Amino acid sequence: AFAQTGTIRGTVYEEGTGEPLFGVSVLVKETSTGAVTDFDGKFEIKVAPGSYTLQISYISYSSINLTEVVVKGGEVNVVSDLLMAEEASDLETVTVSASAIRTTESALLSVKRNAANLIDGISASTFRQIGDGDAASAVKRVTGVSIEGGKYIYVRGLGDRYTKTVLNGVDIPGLDPDRNTIQMDIFPTNVIDNIIVSKSFTADLPADFTGGVVDIETKDFPEEKTMRLSLSGGINPSMHFNSSYLKYDGGNTDFLGFDDGTRAIPTDGRTDIPQYGDAVGNPNGAKGMEYQEILGNFKKTLGGYRASSLMDVGVSFSLGNQIARPKATWGYNFALTYKNETEFYQDAEYNLYAKPREADQTELEPLERQRGDFGVNNVLLGGLVGIALKTDHSKFKLNLMHLQNGESKEGEFEFVNTNLGANFEAKQYNLEYSQRGLTSILLGGAHYINGNEWEINWKLAPTRSTISDPDIRFTRFREPTNTVSTEVGLPARIWRDLEEYSIVGKADIAKRISLFAREGKVKFGGNYVFKQRDFNIQSFQFATGNTEFRGDPNEILLDQNLFSADNRNGVRYNADFIPINANAYNSIATNMGGYVSMEANPAEKLKAIVGLRVEKFNQYYTGTNQTGTIDYDLVEVLDDMDFFPTVNLIFNLKDNQNLRASASRTIARPSFKELSYAEILDPITGRTFIGGLYPETTNGGTEVLWDGNLVSTHVNNFDLRWEAFQERGQMFSVSAFYKTFEKPIEMVQFLSDPGTFQPRNVGDGTVAGLEFEFRKSLKFIAPSLENFSWNTNVTITKSQIEMSESEYRSRQLSAREGQVIDDKRDMAGQAPYLINTGLSFNSYVTGWEAGLFYNVQGSSLQYVGFGNRTDTYSVPFNSLNLNINKTFGADERIQAGLGVDNILNSKREFVYESYQAQDQIFSSLSPGTKVNLRVSFSF
């Protein structure tokens, strides 16, 4: 009988560029059989079980002898990251043991070292070493990157507005369409090849970024068959198995991330429903009976209950392989992930403070104080299916992804109001549910002509995103009388729905050329993006008439308390969206772009890439203002036609050292929500967002504080970087960057309405910064520390905004005695420093891996003060996390891990800051310390 054959697969890269090498000869010395690498630099050879030597050769490159390539029957031996250097007169064949090749990080570092633009990244091998289960955990280890709320990525301390996330090079919306960055925790690391962060702009990238573009690259062709099941559980002593946890009974499918109709609006979304005035005169008439039917169909539950909370659980499954056929190779990936997480915040605070009227008083005065508990249950269900086909000269891929997210909240708060003389204390109850869905399809192809002389890439990606907030419930009783009134706020029910469609198409064509007697590349292409959003809010308020209550919110809508022919002064609803619904809008945006760029080596040690991008962006709005005096019907609210030049230079100082310089122009545009008249309330915090089209005036309308003309922000970017690379992935780099902002958009506090925030263009600004990064093995201290390494990256920035005339004047008018008002301030959202550092241990022999990681971001301006509304700043969150992993079992197919998050028990806080005043709490949450256990099985 014949022994079952095995397979050798690998990838060959050019050391000088980090690009895959096409046409490399790979010969098995013992059998004289072999293969030639394809356009991805990949090869595959079938051999009998045994130990072999691979002879790898390519014209003008130093050959490689790869020894100790062990092949087992029916299995795949993957030899990744074979780097071939251009041949020099004193170079001979390089011999290396296959057992020494452990990681794809070296290929990523090679790409980073030789890329003409400034990039950072993290590879799949690092995911496995550290034990990161999702992209959010992994990407925060990249230089200059931080994660907000465990999900959203910031680059160089710049906020979400200036960071963009793409999937396989294509722009897709996330579960929150108002963010540029998609939730990073929805991608399991076992379907990701690399995460690349581009910090400098090149013409083939979208122009709407400043801090960085984060590209999540999923696997096309797994090198070997992979089947992986991962289980995880998390316990936070302050949140889990806590009998004081707040919840309420929802639908039967909440555990899957969507409502089953339990929270459906009783009017079916109609706008022609009767009001109280239509029913009170004739309760038994047609409108009166319809009014009572609708009133009776509102769910009675307005308050939750306390019960023991459950721990966090998660499960993910992935499957992938490639199937070689005589004329083509097929690849497939499948991933399914499920998370069910519970949070419980006790003594949460949300406050409003302002400067007193008297200029000689510096301490801030409370307007509203809210303190209490709230529970959150968050469910995420996601699926990803990928199919790829590779022929001799082409590659095609199809990815389908669906994400479903459901989040329920229940809160109970003590509320104190001292604003405008309306002094009262109240008990507040909140019930919320939000469900979000994202369905995305990506179809793409790559074609190679004349070997790899010509390369054509194209992608088409339609996406549908939905958000539904069914039946948000708010109730507030005045204490101690347990009365309900307009003064304390009437009970309210809110239904919000958003539906967004987008389609992205792009094509890139690259041609290898000879320029300055050296190899170069010309690249050109274009893209088209279409997005449409429908947004609608329908809200109801409930007047209670003469009905008396005992402080139980579930009493209010009992049948005996409702309006009827016998109880005409009972509880009744009023539909706030009739006759004008200013919170409903429709928006359309189109973006048509094109570019041309050239990559060349004008001197032996100098590489340059220059390019020009043009984008035509239009946004249209349909909606009305709050008073109904302005009615837009597909009115153009943004019309941008911009050119974006870019230059990137890299000078090779030595074989392992580079000096980089880049300059470019980019843009940041307002979102659909920001370019609207919508008012959107967050019932838990009591804060309201108002669209940027809404103007604000004072002094009887004679002084304009904001004109409602929200425009895009143009950004000029300049970068300089020195970097040195050493063996085993060690490196050191120093970077400097400088950015100018024309009319940046920031969230400003509305002067006439406390707790309301609006996006506005402010004065021009600048950001200057330094970045430091090193990765160093501790072997230089002692040989026994060979398995220890220290990774650190630090970003330090200084930002400055020139205040607008209205902001500067408002600050002068509300200045305290002795206070000197400068016409410049910090830029909103820009952290002054960012520190990522970690000590890692990795032993391939024993299978133990461990790491202690620290991350902190400096205090940054979140909401811009105006008049007597003072600035709000974040408080640094000192994140210290521990990860320990152990692989064991046959072929190390089992991995178990322990993680401890927020070891220092830091709080997430934002505070008001004012001249010679004690900082006051804007918001405060205590996430506590969490212990995570995980185990994964590879089959």
Model-derived regions, located:
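Structural signature of Gram-negative outer-membrane beta-barrels, strongest in the C-terminal barrel
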Residues: 433-444, 459-463, 496-506, 512-570, ...
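Transmembrane beta-barrel wall of Gram-negative outer-membrane proteins
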Residues: 7, 278, 285-411, 439, ...
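Short, acidic Ser/Thr/Gly-rich low-complexity loop/linker segments typical of extracellular
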Residues: 31-42, 704
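Short, acidic, small-residue-rich periplasmic hinge/interaction motif at the N-terminus
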Residues: 13, 17, 25-27, 57-61, ...
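Outer membrane beta-barrel strand-and-loop segments of large Gram-negative receptors
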Residues: 487, 498, 502-508, 553, ...
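Gram-negative outer-membrane beta-barrel transporters
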Residues: 731, 736-742, 756-860
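Conserved C-terminal beta-signal and adjacent last beta-strands/turns
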Residues: 490-498, 508-514, 519-522, 647, ...
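Periplasmic N-terminal accessory/gating domains of Gram-negative outer-membrane beta-barrel systems
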Residues: 70, 75, 100-154, 160, ...
